């Protein structure tokens, strides 16, 4: 039986967040504030990989008393590697919502089972349907 702690160290938390998959962006993360993103839908897969842009989501996970708040955004990941807060076309929106929902469920489960910490949506977070 694994030990559950609700006061994890930064490194223990990072290890669990990394194990969730390729979402965590270490260089943009710091203790108490973690950055995630997902390139859900390629805009034009005929372009060479280094020139591709994507529709997707990004999120800042901020530590709070007893848990975290998740502030999700949706938009376009451009060729320069920047997220742009743009409306996603309907033909890509379903997949973006699906990847975000799957990730969020995994995040909530990971933090609850390992650390007894909750995750709430930030008041400015994009709603996924």
Swiss-Prot record:
Lineage top rank: taxon: Bacteria
Residue ranges of the TM segments: none
Main subcellular location: cytoplasm
Compartments (UniProt record): Cytoplasm
Cysteine-cysteine disulfides: none
UniProt keywords, alphabetically: Activator, Cytoplasm, Transcription, Transcription regulation
Record has Transmembrane helix as a keyword: no
GO cellular component: cytoplasm
Record flagged with keyword Protein biosynthesis: no
An annotated GO BP: positive regulation of DNA-templated transcription
UniProt-annotated stretches for the region Essential for activity: 99-119
Family listed: Belongs to the Crl family.
Function as written in the Swiss-Prot or TrEMBL entry: Binds to the sigma-S subunit of RNA polymerase, activating expression of sigma-S-regulated genes. Stimulates RNA polymerase holoenzyme formation and may bind to several other sigma factors, such as sigma-70 and sigma-32.
Name the UniProt record assigns to this protein: Sigma factor-binding protein Crl
Organism, as annotated: Vibrio vulnificus (strain YJ016)
Taxonomic placement: Bacteria, Pseudomonadati, Pseudomonadota, Gammaproteobacteria, Vibrionales
